[in-house]
A protein has these predicted regions:
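C-terminal lobe and adjacent flexible extensions of AdoMet/dcAdoMet transferase-like proteins
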Residues: 214-223
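C-terminal alpha-helical "lid/dimerization" subdomain adjacent to the S-adenosyl-L-methionine
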Residues: 151-214
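Conserved class I S-adenosyl-L-methionine
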Residues: 1-47, 60-64, 174, 209
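Class I SAM-dependent methyltransferase SAM/SAH-binding core
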Residues: 50-54, 58-109
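A short acidic, Gly/Pro-enriched loop at the edge of an enzyme's catalytic core
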Residues: 108-120
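A short SAM/SAH-binding and catalytic strip from SAM-dependent methyltransferases
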Residues: 119-131
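A short glycine-rich, Lys/Arg-flanked "PGG" loop and its adjoining helix->strand segment in the class I
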Residues: 133-145
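Short glycine-centered segments of the SAM/dcSAM-binding site in methyltransferase folds
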Residues: 50, 147-148
Length: 223
């Protein structure tokens, strides 16, 4: 599986693009992050330990995870230095610098040891990964035994989706909402085959009003 299943293009994250993402995340998209953080905790049962937010951008989901789970430390991971700088400014402004760190890294080669993180989350970045198999292989490597992922895209609820899609289309009628894309049976089968290939036998795919989310589980005692 060499190509992204959504067949989307890799974005260019220069500082202008990173600042634009930051503005949207802190305004139009702001309500979704606490909801997604709560959904992630509910879906996985993970409330403590180390959480990685992959493709964190301006750090909004990372901050929501830290705010809703006081016993959890978080690392906001992004391949863009510009995004990491903006994320750190946001983290510091929120007074969360003792709970959240930033790290530069690509999902296809994560800068973490094996069995490292209890929870790995990501909202929206999966649609830009160039090789899903390599990415999920790395994610499963870094996931600690007993850990889970909550990776995908969505708005947390149907009400928030309707609100935000309407507002974004007001701003830009050509805006491409990835939430409009639906996964069919072939897509789901490809995911099942991919997870088997990386050695993950316990997983579930959530495809409902909260969005499209992949919950991988690494069995306790696995290496």
């Amino acid at each position: 599986m060499q190509k992204n299943w959504t067949q989307t293009k890799t974005p260019v994250f220069n500082r202008e693009a990173a600042l634009k993402m930051n503005e949207i995340a802190k305004t139009v998209f702001a309500p979704i992050y606490p909801v997604i953080a709560q959904n992630a905790r509910h879906a996985t049962g993970i409330n403590r330990g180390l959480c990685l937010d992959l493709g964190s951008g301006p750090g909004m989901l990372a901050m929501a995870m830290a705010s809703t789970a006081p016993d959890m430390s978080v690392v906001a991971v992004d391949s863009s230095e510009e995004s990491n700088e903006i994320a750190w400014e946001n983290i510091r402004d929120a007074g969360l610098e003792a709970r959240i760190k930033t790290a530069k890294g690509d999902v296809h080669g994560l800068p973490f040891p094996d069995n490292h993180a209890n929870l790995i989350v990501s909202r929206g970045s999966m649609f830009f990964w160039t090789d899903l198999l390599d990415a999920f292989k790395e994610i499963f490597r870094v996931l600690a035994p007993g850990g889970h992922t909550y990776i995908g895209g969505g708005f947390g609820s149907s009400a928030l989706k309707d609100l935000i899609v309407a507002e974004m289309l007001k701003r830009d009628p050509s805006w491409d909402c990835y939430a409009k894309k639906k996964s069919d049976a072939d897509d789901l089968k490809r995911f099942e085959e991919m997870f088997a290939a990386i050695g993950c036998s316990t997983f579930r795919i959530i495809n409902d009003e909260t969005g499209f989310w992949i919950v991988l589980s690494k069995t306790a005692g696995a290496e």
